[in-house]
Amino acid sequence: LEEKIRLESAHKEFLANMETLSDLEYRKEMERLGVDLSWKSSQIEGNTYSLLETERLLKEKQTAQGKTKEEAVMLLNHKDALDFILDNPDYLKELSVRRLEDIHSILTKELGVGNGIRKRRVGITGTNYRPLDNEFQIREALEDTCQLINGKENVFEKALLTLVLLSYIQAFTDGN
């Protein structure tokens, strides 16, 4: 309970601080966050761009030498997904399978990854974990996840549940 109170207080402080930012300051802060999130998320997917190379790509559209086109596309897609979410702040207030699929399609655009819930088995490199392999069970797990998250009030609880459950379900062939 004490931790929950601290988190709620931190969230209120964050919102108050955000209100003091000008539009330009807000955009700059979101740009910085976008670079960090794009870089780290893409690293998890095996991308070899450095943080500095990612920043150059996202800000100046300058690709890094010795890197593949797919790595650049992956990073640019992460930026596009974050921009979409920032430009449509209410879009994910209530999660749905369709909205998750929409964000996934932005993340995987031009990467040769099929859209929609996967229809085949996947493995997680370096683990023995085997996610659900039936499209209907995956959809049901996603629907249950959306319902659970939509029923929560606390933004931190929602974020943690989203991260953990979507990672666990591995609903898409790639780009989870």
Residues covered by each model-derived region:
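FIC/Doc superfamily catalytic core
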Residues: 1-174
